[in-house]
Swiss-Prot record:
Provenance organism: Allorhizobium ampelinum (strain ATCC BAA-846 / DSM 112012 / S4)
One of the protein's GO biological processes: L-tryptophan biosynthetic process
InterPro entries tied to this protein: Aldolase_TIM, Indole-3-glycerol_P_synth, Indole-3-glycerol_P_synth_dom, Indole-3-GlycerolPSynthase_CS, RibuloseP-bd_barrel
MF-aspect GO terms: indole-3-glycerol-phosphate synthase activity; phosphoribosylanthranilate isomerase activity
Protein name per its UniProtKB record: Indole-3-glycerol phosphate synthase
Annotated NCBIfam families: PRK00278.1-2 (NF001370), PRK00278.1-6 (NF001373), PRK00278.2-4 (NF001377)
Keyword Lyase belongs to the record: yes
Amino acid sequence: MSDILKKIEAYKREEIAAAKNAVPLDEIKARAADQPPARGFYKALRAKQAAGNFGLIAEIKKASPSKGLIRPDFDPPALASAYEAGGAACLSVLTDAPSFQGAPDFLVAARAACTLPALRKDFMFEAYQVHEARAWGADCILLIMASLSDSEATDLEGEALALGMDVLIEVHDEEEMLRALKLASPLVGINNRNLRTFEVDLAVSERLAAMVPADRLLVGESGIFTHEDCLRLQKSGIETFLVGESLMRKDDVTGATKALLTGASDRIAAE
């Protein structure tokens, strides 16, 4: 595990302990059980693919450790609506506060403003967080293989699947890909960002995609800024993308989303 992930795990463990004191596990499980059924994150991505379209997991992200503040005028419900209007299949909402200025309320508000399934984008270490995610309405969780052992990943995946959620397994090298392919989830995200240096290279996705059987749905993550980037990764069998920063920086988020997916101009013609 990188030094960055070790620091994140340390503060996450403290957060989880505090959360358990505030809302015991039994209570958070009850809240999760009271939620309506999940919207079907994986299903929404497959539907885009079946229709011959790129699948976009559009990210609602206020800030990041490497870039600082990304969007000062941060309005999660408005962003969710803009993404949906632009053709996104799903949302990804940061709930981590220390590194990304995220919050659970952002997830709740964004999901309520649209019909898209939503991923809780956070660093998951314990089952408590999985039930917490469902209690907040999340339809999918993220498991980062670089921060989890095989047994931890298996256990967390099992908790999520039992709650009717989907699981996005994130990898960034060959060893993590081999581990991810032993899990049940068909959703595998390839992070093009080196977690040690923060450098981004789309060749990571191109290299690792060759390892993946056709029954898995690959998601390209990080470093995807243009329609041309999408077309490049499509050649490696990747037709689903998780994109945040490049869209978050645009004034016209709906237009930028359409442009990313279709290559159309950012300018939306008057209708």
